[in-house]
Amino acid sequence: MGKPTRVTNEIRRLRFVNGEMTQAELARRLNVTRQTVIAIEQGRYSPSLEIAFQIARVFDAPLDAVFQYPHSDN
């Protein structure tokens, strides 16, 4: 895979506060592979906008509560 993304996320925490959902269960609900969930969770892959919204919906959370992008000082 390429270089890590600057986007961070709260997916792992959200999985645990939502009944200790497994990566496999989240992958099933998103119709992606478990490996994709792992890569997104670890910041090695940025999801498509569609998948990002689906993740937020699974956790009934706003998109910016799931994903964060650092502000640029430029």
Regions found by a protein language model. Name each.
Residues T5, F16, N31, Q42:
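Residue-level detection of the helix-turn-helix DNA-binding "recognition helix"
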Residues E25, T36, A65:
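Residues in the helix-turn-helix
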Residues R12, I38-A39, F67:
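Key DNA-contacting residues within the recognition helix of helix-turn-helix
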Residues M1, R57, F67-N74:
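Short, charged recognition helix plus adjacent turn
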Residues E10-R29:
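Short basic helix-loop element that most often maps to the first helix and adjoining turn
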Residues V32-S46:
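Recognition helix of helix-turn-helix/homeodomain-like DNA-binding domains
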Residues E50-A65:
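DNA major-groove recognition helix of helix-turn-helix/homeodomain DNA-binding modules
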